[in-house]
Amino acid sequence: MLLALAQWLAQDVRFFNVFNYITLRAVLAAMTALLLSLAAGPAVIRWLAAKKIGQAVRNDGPQTHLVKSGTPTMGGVLILIAIGITTLLWGDLTNKYVWTVLVVTLGYGIVGWYDDWKKVVYRDPNGLASRWKFFWQSVLGIGAALFIAFSAKSPAQTELIIPFFKTMAYPLGVIGFITLTYFVIVGTSNAVNLTDGLDGLAIMPTVMIAAAFALIAYVTGHAVYAKYLLIPYVPGAGELCIFLGAIAGAGLGFLWFNAYPAEVFMGDVGALALGAALGTVAVIVRQEIVLLIMGGVFVIETLSVMLQVGYFKYTKRKYGEGRRILRMAPLHHHFEQTGWKETQVVVRFWIITIMLVLIGLSTLKLR
């Protein structure tokens, strides 16, 4: 929106040409989203509290979490509003990838919002039925996969890129690409949601990964840099920097209120949407494996739940009683049960994410 205005004004005042630079607009997007989150946060929290949209806490969870009962949830709405407004302000609205990530993000946000709403307003502990949640996640994931696949301009835009190797890329074909894209988007969405169990635990890794992928998107959308780094050139992908900058800014603004002790929780509306956003971006810039590396915390949290549930069902069938691998899943609760304080778990997981993000960025050059 503002880009179009700047381009029109640039016909008479050359200064406005500066807004054609993606890097400048990405920084402005991050700042705008941050300020929007900080400014609107108190009002959103007050509204959620007034409507008694509070978090229910598991009785079988860590006893230290019982004090969190009633804390306003669905704060992810604040993040999505900041991301949406900022991207529309600073993004190139003629870019197909901008609309792709916006539609997917807001679509998953709506699914998460309805799930949260049923839990906290209608007091339904199960929220949106799992089959319906999975159905709508699948519709959005497959829809995005089809659009990206059939709008690709070259075979390289649908190949699986293997990090650390100069020329190792596997042609996926349409079916393979759609399948991979589906699992990346849906899987990342649910992985972030599973991780969102402690104050600040999910949002800061999301901010770090978004910032790192902003750099990746920039070089992927730049023909010269992409050729130099031996990565696929995806025309228009650079514009995702604005969207990713908005995620980073909105996420930091939300962290202001979500840091321990949290004044508000993200809820499924935020976690599902942010995970889907990261997954969609990774697919567009052809760096799904790099997302797997950077999002290692999300991956291990998801695996901990899968192993815990799988082992419990297996032992119950074999021995007549279910047994557990961990004291409690997801993994962050296991560490709490072993004596780690909540803030220790969160900060240590942040440190791990910093290391993984640096490893992921190193794949751009180490080939």
Curated annotation (Swiss-Prot):
Molecular function per GO: metal ion binding; phospho-N-acetylmuramoyl-pentapeptide-transferase activity; UDP-N-acetylmuramoyl-L-alanyl-D-glutamyl-meso-2,6-diaminopimelyl-D-alanyl-D-alanine:undecaprenyl-phosphate transferase activity
GO terms under biological process: cell division; cell wall organization; peptidoglycan biosynthetic process; regulation of cell shape
GO CC annotations on file: plasma membrane
Topology class, membrane: Multi-pass membrane protein
Transmembrane listed as a keyword: yes
Biological pathway: Cell wall biogenesis; peptidoglycan biosynthesis
Protein name (database record): Phospho-N-acetylmuramoyl-pentapeptide-transferase
Organism: Dechloromonas aromatica (strain RCB)
Gene symbol of the encoding locus: mraY
